Amino acid sequence: AGPHARDLLQKLSDDPLDKETFPYLRHRRITVNGVSCLAIRLGFVGELAYELHFPAAAAVDMWDAILEAGKEWDIRPFGLDAQRLLRLEKGHIIISQDTDFETNPWKVSMEWAVKLDKPDFVGKAALVRAQRRTPRETLVPWQMEPGMATPPEGMTVTIGGNLAGRVTSSKMSYVLGHPVGLAWVVTEHAKEGGTITIGGAPATIAG
């Protein structure tokens, strides 16, 4: 993952990786460092990224080859904590942490992922019904002012002293300099720029 991900991967593969040939949210079989891989053009963080799936026996050699190929850009591994923060800054949801069994695409502003004009598919009827209903609550990104403490995940959200939702994810963004997160908020108040209260502290619904 990173701004040079495509250039780095191209050094290890003869297969075309340009954005026209291999666009976002597509997958294909390519050869990387001599290993056949299922490559997926997507990212968990807000950067150009690829997922590579290949036999575990090739993992050490692949790791070494990627780090060697990336020396000109001074690439470095990053851990789970950094990944989870970057995904939150991007607004990328984690299934089961930010969602539950009642979640549908319209509740999380991901209606673009559903094509209801396709022929019948498993779950289509339920999605059609969900589309017709205004969701009771909506998942929104939020942010606090610099210097404020990061609220714990699971903290209640209130508006005007009334229960209005709950925090699903929260982290201190060291790049932005303030806490950020995701929360379920009653839909009528889930508007960009709106003010919510998390654990007694004010937060702003982000775009």
Give the predicted meaning of each segment.
Residues T103-G207:
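Glycine-rich, small/acidic residue-mixed loop/short-helix segments
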Residues A1-Q131, P135:
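Glycine-rich, acidic
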